[in-house]
Amino acid sequence: MQRIAYIVLCLCLGAVSLWAQDKEKPALQIADNTFFDPTKKEVVEEKYQFGVEYRVEAGYVQHWQRPHDISFRDMYLHGVRLGATFTFKLPLRFGLETGLLYTLVYGRNDQHWRSMDAPSVQTEYIQHRVLEHNLTVPVRAYYTIPLWKKLNLFFYAGPQLHIGLAENDYMQLHLSEGTKNWLETQGVPTEPYDRMADELIRANIQMGLGGGLEWDCYRLQSGYDFGLNNLVKHPQAKGQYMSEWGWFVSFCYRF
């Protein structure tokens, strides 16, 4: 009898336990609403590796010779520039670029003189046709701003050194004999010559600013360079000064 009572008690306790489990509510899981949020942007850590980029460059250039207290007028020289550059990649989208560029430009202007033969006030002139060769060594700091996919906007600033190789003046004389003789006595050249040999300093230091757009391996850029030093080698009077500024637009390809 006691065994039967014990069995009945165990069955009752088991039934109560099962009933309690059925009554217990399961814990609800809260879904992450941001999982399907289209406005949520995944934070991608920008990885950067140091390196060197190599480019070739070709473009149009315009030089502006700006004389002060000299009988020459302002002269614009137009031409082409070719060369190669390499850029050291730095953190935070910065870069440092240098290289070697060759420039060939041509320009002309008229230098007027009072006639020594005419009975009245009359001017004669020398037409200067100048062909200039130089090398340029730029040192530029670049900053790049990503725009869309492989399209970037960039800006640069920095100095550059123009090394004058030659500036040949193929002049044409429109002078009377008396005016020509007088100019020769004053030391004014009346035959073709290299202005770099005696008149001008070969080193032209400039400060440049510019920028452009870059798509993958291709770059289109433009900039302006301000001449900082006097190019007159032997000033004949106080305040005699000439500087050379420049503007360019070029196309670059990265290997």
Task: For each feature predicted by the language model, list its residue ranges.
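Exposed, low-structure sequence patches enriched in small/polar residues
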Residues: 23, 148-162
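Outer-membrane beta-barrel channels and translocator barrels
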Residues: 45, 89-93, 146-150, 216-218
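Residues on the lipid-exposed face of transmembrane beta-strands in outer-membrane beta-barrel proteins
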Residues: 38-40, 56-58, 80-90, 100-102, ...
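Helix-adjacent hinge/juxtasegments
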Residues: 128-134, 141-144, 149-150
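Substrate-binding/catalytic groove segments of enzymes
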Residues: 217-222, 228-233
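Bacterial Sec-dependent N-terminal signal peptides
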Residues: 1-26, 251-255
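Extracellular/periplasm-exposed beta-strand and loop segments of Gram-negative cell-envelope proteins
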Residues: 60-77, 105-135, 164-208, 230-246
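Short glycine/proline- and aromatic-enriched beta-strand/turn motifs that initiate or cap beta-hairpins
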Residues: 21-86
